Amino acid sequence: MSRYTGPSWKQARRLGLSLTGTGKELARRNYVPGQHGPNNRSKLSEYGLQLAEKQKLRFTYGVGEKQFRNLFVQATKIKEGILGFNFMLLLERRLDNVVYRLGLATTRRQARQFVNHGHILVDGKRVDIPSYRVTPGQVISVREKSLKVPAILEAVEATLGRPAFVSFDAEKLEGSLTRLPERDEINPEINEALVVEFYNKML
């Protein structure tokens, strides 16, 4: 299954989760597309709940199914910590996600585009791979030729707050992942235990 590139608002309503971080997708209609009102949502089976939670997490980070599953397999090989949280930490360390967390993009999808287009540097070197795994302390910055890209400047100006696990210099347009986040600092609406249950049955 490839990465979803369709209407994000419709997908957000289907999942019951804001994919942009603004919540605007659910402000008017917080029920599934094609459903006549919020009270007609059918009850999901155990498998359905697990699948829905997996999809929520996958679409939140905008990762294709194959890459998402491979990342889960990598998480199973980490000996310390809790599997579900370790999986989420691997997602958090993706370069496109860190660019989003720093406020250099308004959405993860936009952050992925900035990385793909070569606007982003890691420790002074251009990296155009959204899945690049960021290590705490690495400096994420905007390439000199891209410092005046309107979309980047608008994103920085629109960002009202940043997570405690990142630092950012708005004048230099650079920042870093200062530490790995705690569980209560990321995606409280996700029940990663259901995602683990889903893949434990599949692998």
UniProtKB/Swiss-Prot annotation:
Residues 93-156 form the S4 RNA-binding domain. GO terms for biological process: ribosomal small subunit biogenesis; translation. Keywords: Ribonucleoprotein, Ribosomal protein, RNA-binding, rRNA-binding. GO terms for cellular component: small ribosomal subunit. Pfam families: Ribosomal_S4 (PF00163), S4 (PF01479). One of its GO terms (molecular function) is rRNA binding. InterPro entries: Ribosomal_uS4, Ribosomal_uS4_bac-type, Ribosomal_uS4_CS, Ribosomal_uS4_N, S4_RNA-bd, S4_RNA-bd_sf. Part of the 30S ribosomal subunit. Contacts protein S5. The interaction surface between S4 and S5 is involved in control of translational fidelity. One of the primary rRNA binding proteins, it binds directly to 16S rRNA where it nucleates assembly of the body of the 30S subunit. This is Small ribosomal subunit protein uS4. It comes from Streptococcus gordonii (strain Challis / ATCC 35105 / BCRC 15272 / CH1 / DL1 / V288).
